[in-house]
Amino acid sequence: MTQTYNADAIEVLTGLEPVRRRPGMYTDTTRPNHLGQEVIDNSVDEALAGHAKRVDVILHADQSLEVIDDGRGMPVDIHPEEGVPAVELILCRLHAGGKFSNKNYQFSGGLHGVGISVVNALSKRVEVNVRRDGQVYNIAFENGEKVQDLQVVGTCGKRNTGTSVHFWPDETFFDSPRFSVSRLTHVLKAKAVLCPGVEITFKDEINNTEQRWCYQDGLNDYLAEAVNGLPTLPEKPFIGNFAGDTEAVDWALLWLPEGGELLTESYVNLIPTMQGGTHVNGLRQGLLDAMREFCEYRNILPRGVKLSAEDIWDRCAYVLSVKMQDPQFAGQTKERLSSRQCAAFVSGVVKDAFILWLNQNVQAAELLAEMAISSAQRRMRAAKKVVRKKLTSGPALPGKLADCTAQDLNRTELFLVEGDSAGGSAKQARDREYQAIMPLKGKILNTWEVSSDEVLASQEVHDISVAIGIDPDSDDLSQLRYGKICILADADSDGLHIATLLCALFVKHFRALVKHGHVYVALPPLYRIDLGKEVYYALTEEEKEGVLEQLKRKKGKPNVQRFKGLGEMNPMQLRETTLDPNTRRLVQLTIDDEDDQRTDAMMDMLLAKKRSEDRRNWLQEKGDMAEIEV
């Protein structure tokens, strides 16, 4: 059936409808924990700004969550431009909040913007009580829509201020409607650690338990508690902090020379960054630079030994907290920091502090240096045992493969790059020591239904198999030549198609690689935004709009460039955005043991030749969730 494609066919989503249509773009849909974290972050931001001393969290028996703080209370006056109470605007409008400029909060998670409105959009009901100016206000929402106007429901003392947000998550948006109590507890404890002197309580009405946290010497106490009973080097954590006008960093770290479970946690504006990011990269680089300088100054480095990041990082337990204005995250769930300037800031501060500490604590410093040197020597011995496939040993390596010189699987990376032009730029941009590049011509074969004994008939698949050193459907990874195999395709729809076909190849015929965490997908940016000497990169249209929104308060007109493909980037841009470990974005391709069958069923439906009818039905059902380039 042919439909007319004109202006009437263009749909504009307003209010909170985009969130309800595509919740996965805004939050983690596994459980409603991330919604709770958004509300908790708002209260903790009040504490971070010095306006709150207590945050109470209650998990009710009906799986609803209530967060209460003694901050200033959400504003209830009428917004001058929108003509509605500010609290209503905050709950009902994306990107409405008091944290986009730095007038109200020097540092924040950027919430009361997307965060709290997403909670409203994905909840069956939200009730907000505000204590402010001697009065108690109440407003309520259901399914993202206001069902009760803001009204005064009581009075209170003028100094009795704060906000209470009680929400009931809509189970239809989540894989499991239940909060993970352990994750909630962990987040709350971490918030208490990062806000010394602030009291945080958690009441679990389902399990009838109550917990309270209040740390006076936050990071130090937390790390010491986590490694209690284990031999540590040094005995007391190496702690430090530094605050500038727009950035601040606090850390506590130590090493476990005899092994043990490592505490490795990082935060940005008190938001946990589970996947690390540029701040963690900066910490690692700062420690490495300082240790290298100390070893060279003391002349204790054996000839031929060069320390690398993993030598100093291997047994390091740390808690890192960074506060900064306008943090950039990889995705709305804020699990990985991508602000490039943060790596240099943290690295410089940590290097200076660690060099000073090493020279003031020479005995402990020499033990640390000895541990790092031993690690480097073990790594180098192990690398010598790895026999690389040469022309005289096994199949000849593909001629288009630009190999690396390192042999350590902990460092080596192979990038499968879409297109010869991008492959040429990538070869110039790479670090030749540990990064290998292999360009691919066009779209590879859909191998989902091809048997393992026939799949090597495809030249591209054959070259990939020879380059990585693994045969299709083999569980033997002893001849693996690279620790990371990274798929690097354009950010447009064609590139996504190629990335999908490569993912299918690895899931179907090289599953052992996926199971052991060796396969990654690189996320090149779609946009570059320039304002003066500042450069920003955006992965999606939403990220681009977010950056432009932040740049509105700066002088000058930003210039936006859309990359049509990787080949348009010069080597320096390609290195910064997709190859440099400190600034790139990589997503690991993973399959949980429990999801094996579900993954195979989904891939079969998407890629099998005889499943076109199933694909059509699936598109009719899920098509409104797709992001389509026109």
Swiss-Prot record:
Keywords: Antibiotic resistance, ATP-binding, DNA-binding, Isomerase, Magnesium, Metal-binding, Nucleotide-binding, Topoisomerase. Its cofactor is Mg(2+); Mn(2+); Ca(2+). The keyword Endoplasmic reticulum does not apply. The record marks 443, 446, 497, 615 as: Interaction with DNA. One of its GO terms (cellular component) is DNA topoisomerase type II (double strand cut, ATP-hydrolyzing) complex. Mg(2+) 2 binds at residues 490, 492. ATP binds at residues 5, 42, 69, 110-116, 334. GO terms for molecular function: ATP binding; DNA binding; DNA topoisomerase type II (double strand cut, ATP-hydrolyzing) activity; metal ion binding. InterPro entries: DNA_gyrase_B_C, HATPase_C_sf, Ribosomal_Su5_D2-typ_SF, Ribsml_uS5_D2-typ_fold_subgr, Topo_IIA, Topo_IIA-like_dom_sf, Topo_IIA_B_C, Topo_IIA_bsu_dom2. Pyrrolopyrimidines inhibit both GyrB and its paralog in topoisomerase IV (parE). Heterotetramer composed of ParC and ParE. Topoisomerase IV is essential for chromosome segregation; it is the principal protein responsible for decatenating newly replicated chromosomes. It relaxes supercoiled DNA. MukB stimulates the relaxation activity of topoisomerase IV and also has a modest effect on decatenation. This is DNA topoisomerase 4 subunit B. It comes from Escherichia coli (strain K12).
